Every structure is written in structure tokens, then in C-alpha cells.
């Protein structure tokens, strides 16, 4: 998809704040600081529409971005960050669960993991949650530029095995620095929207 227009629509915390209009939605989920904002900015050719932060746990709302007036990206709060209170974590958990399990416009979740490391227990729980609710998922392993090309396959195998990725689910190696995987990610997203 050639992105010519993108903007943030709303930062929502409850269903009545979600945008109306019935556009398909792709949610982006991942551990805090895994590079979700960089992924969004790379996909839409913008430097900082999605704010990148060195402070993990910065996104505390569901941020809806409209792309070319045909689709929403929904940035979900990062999971697995310890420096917020248990109450806050539980509130985020409920907000995310409500959105993921009840939003009709949701077509798929892009789950972002760090290619350099084996997925965390939180990553595994998120993937299992999506499979349990039969929510289509695309796994994006980001920061591919940070490891030598010769080791990509080995790292990808660790991601696949740790998450126990099912055959029908795509694993795409991605880098916001080099734009590797950008076209492949768009084509996977477009397939999900067309379903």
C-alpha cells in the first residue's frame, strides 16, 4: 500500500470512544519498547506520527491512526513492563482484552517481537491469547538490522519455536532502519483486510 495520508484519530480507553465508520482495523501489540512506534512510522512513511519513547510503558491508551482513509492501525499499550502499578497493569489488561475480543472491525493483530532475543513469557501469552480467541495474527520480528544477515534464520527459528507459531501464521523479519520486510508486512496486512 502506498500511504499518502495518515493521522491520529483518537486515543481511546473505552469502547464508546472507538471511532465509528466501520473501517477495518489492524491492532499492533508487543512488549514495551519493542519498536511498535518505529514500525508504525516506517509503514506509513512518517518520522514521528507515532511517538517513539525511551520510556517503556508510554502508550497507555488505544491509539487509532487512520491510513489513506481506508484502514485504522490501533496501537495497543505495551505489555510486560514492570514499572507501573499492578492496578494500572490490570486496567490496561482489561482494556486490551475488551478491545481484542469484542471489536468487530478488528481484522488481525500484528504481534511485534524482537528478533535478537527469544520471545518472553508475555509474548507467548499474547500469542496464545490471540490463538485462543481465533484472532488472525502476523508476527513481525523487528530490529533485524541489529544482527548479521547470516544469523537471521537461526533467530527466526527461535522465535517460531518459542511462540509455537502455527503454519498458517506469517513470521516477517523487519527493520525500521533498512525498511526490510515493509512490503511483505503491507502485503500480509492487505490480505487480512481483504478477508
Curated annotation (Swiss-Prot):
PROSITE patterns per record: G_ENGB
Cellular component GO terms held in the UniProt record: cytosol
One MF term in the entry's GO annotations: GTP binding
Ranges where the EngB-type G domain occurs: 22-195
Family annotation (PANTHER family): ENGB-TYPE G DOMAIN-CONTAINING PROTEIN, MSS1/TRME-RELATED GTP-BINDING PROTEIN
Family, per entry: Belongs to the TRAFAC class TrmE-Era-EngA-EngB-Septin-like GTPase superfamily. EngB GTPase family.
Protein name, as recorded: Probable GTP-binding protein EngB
Species annotation: Bacillus licheniformis (strain ATCC 14580 / DSM 13 / JCM 2505 / CCUG 7422 / NBRC 12200 / NCIMB 9375 / NCTC 10341 / NRRL NRS-1264 / Gibson 46)
UniProt gene name: engB
Amino acid at each position: 500500500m502506498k500511504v499518502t495520508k495518515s493521522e491520529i484519530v483518537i486515543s481511546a480507553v473505552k469502547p464508546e470512544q472507538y471511532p465509528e465508520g466501520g473501517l477495518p482495523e489492524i491492532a499492533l501489540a508487543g512488549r514495551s519498547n519493542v519498536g511498535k512506534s518505529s514500525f508504525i512510522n516506517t509503514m506509513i512513511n512518517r518520522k514521528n506520527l507515532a511517538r517513539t519513547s525511551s520510556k517503556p510503558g508510554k502508550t497507555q491508551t488505544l491509539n487509532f491512526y487512520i491510513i489513506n482513509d481506508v484502514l485504522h492501525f490501533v496501537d495497543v499499550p505495551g505489555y510486560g513492563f514492570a514499572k507501573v502499578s499492578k492496578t494500572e497493569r490490570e486496567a490496561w489488561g482489561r482494556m486490551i482484552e475488551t478491545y481484542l475480543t469484542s471489536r468487530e472491525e478488528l481484522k488481525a493483530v500484528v504481534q511485534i517481537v524482537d528478533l535478537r532475543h527469544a520471545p518472553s513469557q508475555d509474548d507467548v501469552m499474547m500469542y496464545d491469547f490471540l490463538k485462543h480467541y481465533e484472532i488472525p495474527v502476523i508476527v513481525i520480528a523487528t530490529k533485524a538490522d541489529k544482527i548479521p544477515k547470516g544469523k537471521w534464520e537461526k533467530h527466526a527459528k527461535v522465535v517460531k519455536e518459542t511462540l509455537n507459531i502455527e503454519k498458517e501464521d506469517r513470521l516477517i523479519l523487519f527493520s525500521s532502519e533498512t525498511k526490510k520486510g515493509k512490503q511483505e508486512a503491507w502485503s500480509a496486512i492487505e490480505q487480512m483486510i481483504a478477508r
